[in-house]
Amino acid sequence: KCNPKGFTNEGCRGIDKKHWNSQCRTSQSYVRALTMDSRKKIG
């Protein structure tokens, strides 16, 4: 199953295991950056 966000609650799943970690870390970092930015704007 594919996840639009590129990661799931259980972990990150990519097409290839070699890119699995890199895609996971990039996605999480990107989401965290947006979350922090949103909190700063709202708060």
Swiss-Prot record:
Residue ranges of coiled coil: none
Sorted UniProt keywords: Growth factor, Secreted
An annotated GO cellular component: dendrite
Family matches, as PROSITE patterns: NGF_1, NGF_2
Molecular function as annotated in GO: growth factor activity; nerve growth factor receptor binding
Major localization class: secreted
Subcellular location: Secreted
Gene3D superfamilies in UniProt: Cystine-knot cytokines (2.10.90.10)
Highest taxon, organism lineage: Eukaryota
GO BP: any one term: cell surface receptor protein tyrosine kinase signaling pathway
Pfam families found in the cross-reference section: NGF
Function: Promotes the survival of neuronal populations that are all located either in the central nervous system or directly connected to it.
Family the entry assigns: Belongs to the NGF-beta family.
Protein name per Swiss-Prot or TrEMBL: Neurotrophic factor BDNF
Species: Raja clavata
